[in-house]
Amino acid sequence: MSEGIDIKELKRRMDGAISVFKGDIASLRTGRASANILDPVTVEAYGSRMPLNQVANITVPEPRMLSVSVWDKSMVSAVERGIRESNLGLNPIIDGQNLRIPLPELNEERRKSLVKVAHDYAEKSKVAIRHVRRDGMDGLKKAEKDGVIGQDESRAQSERVQKMTDETISEIDRLLGEKEKEIMQV
């Protein structure tokens, strides 16, 4: 096979877009408790802001409850403040060196807005995937124009890039559908 574009590099970049999308939708609060809900929370600790998971252990003891075990007893109130200020709508209850965080039921309006946010994340990921596709296609056109690859090779590689793009976008749609079902499940 002649030179053209690095298909593996394009695949890596498309897989990166899927990974970012998975991370984005994992942070969306559904009806079930998940430690990922607290990923955006930062805590004022030891003179700087730190992610919550660097000062405490987060577990899910019940489907609608999170438990945060703070490692340093002096940090409990700072952790509580960080969770309250995170705009996640959570109200932690201090229980010794632990915090219990009951997750309120999501109302229909909130569920629909979360689905809309998930769709926005999906669209952002699809745009990133299309940019990768465009970079690949531009690389093929340049390689063909420069005489590095022939027209047949260029066409074959562009079909592979298009197939890879379609598969990656289908994966985004599949993940979005799963998340949408999870959010709307009462």
Swiss-Prot record:
Keywords: Cytoplasm, Protein biosynthesis
Keyword check for Protein biosynthesis: yes
Transmembrane segments: none
Superkingdom of origin: Bacteria
Gene Ontology MF, one: ribosomal large subunit binding
Matching Gene3D superfamilies: 3.30.1360.40, Ribosome-recycling factor (1.10.132.20)
CDD domains linked to this entry: RRF
Subcellular location: Cytoplasm
Primary location class: cytoplasm
GO cellular component: cytosol
GO biological process: cytoplasmic translational termination
The protein's name: Ribosome-recycling factor
Gene name per UniProt: frr
